Amino acid sequence: MQHGAAHLHYCLPRLLTLWLDFTENIEDFVKKKGKSMTLAATIENASKVIDRFLSSHWRSLIPDYFFLTALPQLVSRLCHPHAKSFTILSSILTSLLSGPHSQQTFWHMVAVSKNRNQVRSSRCLKMFEEAKKVSKQMRKTLEDSITFASMIDDLCDKVKTEKGTKSISLQEHMRSLPALVNRSDGIILPNQRNLLVTLPTGNTDLQQHQPFPSGLVYIQSIDDEVAVMTSLVQPKKITFLGSDGRRYSFLAKPKDDLRRDSRLMDYSCLLNKLFKKDFKSRSRNLHIRTYCVIPTNETSGLIEWANNLKAIRPIIYQLHKDEGRYINVKWTKQYESPEGASLEVKRKNLLQCLEDLRGPVFSNWFTNNFTDPQSWFIARYIIITIIIIISISIIRMAFVRSTAVMSMMGYIIGLGDRHLENINVDTTTGDTFHVDMNCLFNKGETLAVPEVVPFRLTNNMVDAFGPVGVEGPFR
């Protein structure tokens, strides 16, 4: 790590794990009866050597921004029982909080400051206080950020709306939020651009490298109108004006533990790095679409809004409607099997449903949405047709490959609840985009109606793969 970042994602997590795991259990091991005094003394001395080395050398060995890549791992160890190791851990986090990457560190720690575990939250708050002592500007920035996060919590949990409400005004429901945003100039947008570190390549000077080369985007103002989503918990879509003049939207979601989603995004980002390292996956542009998830407490938080997305279910419903078949809750109810029905009855109802649907229709969406017949001219008919075929093929290929990647990843982590409202498609690139990933580690197998398939591969999904189905790029 002293000589470059090529192996940072392998080395740093392992170094931290070995160090913190070793010192976490050392006192119990030393005190355990039946152990050789010589062995116990050797282990204790080894711990002291490690702690002494880290406490005096970590700043000079690697730059601070390297630790931004391992922030979730560092923050998860705030309850570390070994006093000396925690002192070093605390110094690393406090240094990040009070340095040039203060805001990035804050967004990773804000939820921990409100944790129900008193030791964890008190230690986090103490680090905040230590960072505030650096300068008046640092104090103001951190205090504004803490207040901003608390207001987001209030917007999620305390601002109630009537069923059917499509939007609310912040001036009517939470005037203090736009007032804070207008008077503060140091709160960065919690999106991937601001939080995802760009590591140096080649012979770049590690200390001089800029980990955020595009520059940071700060919150300038917030739109008064807040859209209210129609789902059960009624999350709210808020839009900020960034310091670069662009608008950025986020979903303020209540009554949901977003810490799992946040860790899953970290996992997805790591997989993307592995895909880029491998020639075959890189040439196929294999990747997972990611977005920023910031828990602001244990039950709510902010989710970066992704544009140009459309859930697959309404797409398929509209395609059936265009062919004269109207699918709604009442229509699907007639095919539901009663509780305790035999497998034969369930099979019969399913086959009847599929027969009435008259086959899959999802492939029609690609043909309908990635052509422009009005631009056709008779003299250019052949050329335009070829261009359209190529365009559809590229979009379809992106859909197939992104579906394959998400199917593999979902199988590995036991991802369930993959109904067509949770699978979106990008209307500009064709990529699949999965949301609401709370059903993890094969939890779907424990539901009242167990999920017995590893990923979604229904007839409509296969239909969108093209003539070769699963035997082509998907496999």
What spans do the regions from the language model cover?
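C-terminal catalytic region of ATP-dependent kinase domains
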Residues: 22-26, 33-39, 51-120, 126, ...
